[in-house]
């Protein structure tokens, strides 16, 4: 079975080669998201990555659309994807990475790391005039308990 696959993800050469080797009967085109062309979207049976909605909606034969975001609401509107198109998304792909980044930012804020960095860049070595804060016993409000919102409290041991 021959399929035409448009990949709109920033893949390196090794990942491209691995993808092509996994299904040698498929034909691939690789575009970085900032450089997606309408003719490539119209050519494709499968689109991997968030091609512009305006282009996706013009492809009436697309069979599978893989969104690289967890919230693909724009693609779910009537008329964007054909009725028989399978759509998948990246729910669950970012919870660990983003929640660890959030934890790093929270620690940085609590410990005034950004103020210290700014003072260091200005060659000011005076201490910051306020008590040091920590995260032990701190309270955090998580709004939204999707993959990221439920991962963050676990990382913070709350």
Task: For every predicted segment, state its role.
Residues 13, 38, 95-96, 150:
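Loop/helix-junction capping segments adjacent to catalytic residues or to phosphate/diphosphate-binding pockets
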Residues 83-139:
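Phosphate-binding beta-alpha-beta segment of Rossmann-like dinucleotide-binding domains, i.e.
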Residues 130-158:
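Rossmann-like dinucleotide/phosphate-binding beta-alpha-beta segment
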């Amino acid at each position: 079975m021959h399929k035409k696959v448009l990949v709109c993800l920033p893949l390196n050469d090794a990942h491209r080669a691995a993808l092509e080797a996994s299904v040698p009967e498929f034909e691939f085109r690789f575009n970085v998201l900032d450089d997606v062309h309408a003719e490539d979207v119209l050519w494709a049976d499968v689109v991997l990555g968030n091609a512009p909605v305006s282009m996706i909606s013009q492809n009436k034969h697309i069979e599978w659309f893989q969104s690289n975001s967890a919230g693909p609401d724009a693609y779910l509107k009537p008329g964007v994807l054909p009725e028989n198109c399978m759509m998948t998304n990246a729910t669950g792909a970012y919870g660990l990475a983003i929640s660890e980044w959030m934890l790093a930012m929270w620690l940085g804020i609590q410990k005034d790391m950004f103020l210290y960095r700014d003072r260091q860049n200005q060659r000011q070595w005076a201490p910051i005039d306020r008590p040091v804060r920590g995260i032990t016993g701190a309270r955090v409000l998580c709004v939204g308990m999707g993959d990221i919102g439920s991962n963050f409290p676990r990382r913070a041991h709350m």
